[in-house]
Amino acid sequence: MELDLSLDASGVEIPEPLNGSLFAHDSWVPVLQQWIELVRSNPDLSCPSVVRQAPEVSLGLHFTNDAGIAELNSQWRQKSGPTDVLSFAALDDTPDWLEGEAVELGDIIVSVDTAQRQAQNHNHSLGYELHWLISHGLLHLLGWDHPDERRLSGMLALQERLLDSTGNVLPKGQRPVEIE
């Protein structure tokens, strides 16, 4: 499966020690491809049939700051203030996909400011936090949601599996988020 990734990190202050490596197109393409392939190739995991069949998928990955994501959060979710990640899915249930065409998944927007704070609060790296947030956004693009604790637990477990598949693991016993 091919991945057409549109990545935008313009206007984001990149922390000095990173030199932009976490915000580079070539860093994210293989990670996202592997995650999508893991979900779409496993019949036990929920995934739209068009994604399972598509030779190519495309998505947008946008890094912004708290002000940028707060504006989107207000406009699209009617919630004030920043959040960590937003996803805007492009897939719907219409059967108008033609075999052989690329499938547009949608867009993932991440606040680097919030990601930095959360990484510090959870005592892990910004890189791990970005992978965690982007995996969460990707699962939303693939139709996953968490309206209740059971579905949230399942989604968080799959996020851990995705990160583990690309070598983003935390020390034994440490969880990326606290499940209440």
Swiss-Prot record:
Q: What are its E.C. numbers?
A: 3.1.-.-
Q: What is the required cofactor set for this protein? A: Zn(2+)
Family matches, as InterPro entries: MetalPrtase_cat_dom_sf_prd, YbeY, YbeY_CS
Q: How is the cofactor bound?
A: Binds 1 zinc ion.
Q: Name one Pfam family in it.
A: YbeY
| General function of this protein | Single strand-specific metallo-endoribonuclease involved in late-stage 70S ribosome quality control and in maturation of the 3' terminus of the 16S rRNA.
| Enzyme superclass (EC) | hydrolase
User: Where does this one sit in the cell?
Assistant: Cytoplasm
Binding-site list for Zn(2+)? 136, 140, 146
User: Could you identify this protein by its name?
Assistant: Endoribonuclease YbeY
One GO cellular-component annotation of the UniProt record comes to: cytoplasm
